[in-house]
């Protein structure tokens, strides 16, 4: 059961996995597992007022991070089957759930990204895009796993980093 914290809620139902997450007694997909090999699950996102933001969508969820994936509270990469606008952010397939396990204030990423956005607003010729994010509560396979920071994945794309990919020239 989740208590209303006034934050949006992300509900993930992800079957299978190739790694034990002993803290919650679930299997999860490792970072090394390609999304093509992850069993599809479902994700539903609720606004802070309880209304549906993203109706049950097909999604694949796996661990992310080189170091953070080994912390007790796991960060996740999420890939939707089709682009979707999430919590007021532009539509895309790929999203990130940052666990902020080492940051006891849970504010470091939010503040740093906010400062970067402010710089880009003040410097029109400067940074064309910055990560947007939102604090959420996450329920994973029926287990409330806490407060996370749902944000855009850094990726070359018109809705993300609008640059020419040097490898595609």
Question: Which residues does each PLM region occupy?
Answer:
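Phosphate/dinucleotide-binding and metal-coordinating scaffold of catalytic cores
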Residues: 1-169
């Amino acid at each position: 059961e989740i208590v209303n914290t006034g934050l949006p809620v992300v509900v993930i139902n992800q079957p299978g996995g190739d790694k034990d997450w002993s803290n919650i007694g679930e299997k999860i997909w490792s970072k090394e597992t390609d999304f093509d090999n992850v069993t599809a699950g479902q994700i539903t996102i609720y606004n802070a007022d309880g209304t549906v933001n993203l109706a049950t969508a097909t999604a694949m969820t796996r661990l992310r991070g080189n170091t953070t994936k080994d912390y007790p509270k796991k960060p996740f990469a999420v890939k939707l089957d089709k682009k979707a606008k999430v919590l007021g952010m532009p539509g895309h397939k790929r999203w990130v759930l940052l666990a902020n396990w080492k940051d006891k204030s849970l504010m470091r990423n939010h503040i740093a990204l906010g400062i970067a956005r402010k710089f880009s607003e003040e410097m029109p010729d400067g940074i064309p895009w910055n990560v947007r994010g939102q604090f959420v509560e996450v329920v994973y396979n029926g287990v409330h796993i806490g407060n996370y920071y749902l944000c855009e994945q850094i990726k070359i794309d018109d809705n993300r980093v609008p640059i020419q990919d040097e490898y595609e020239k």
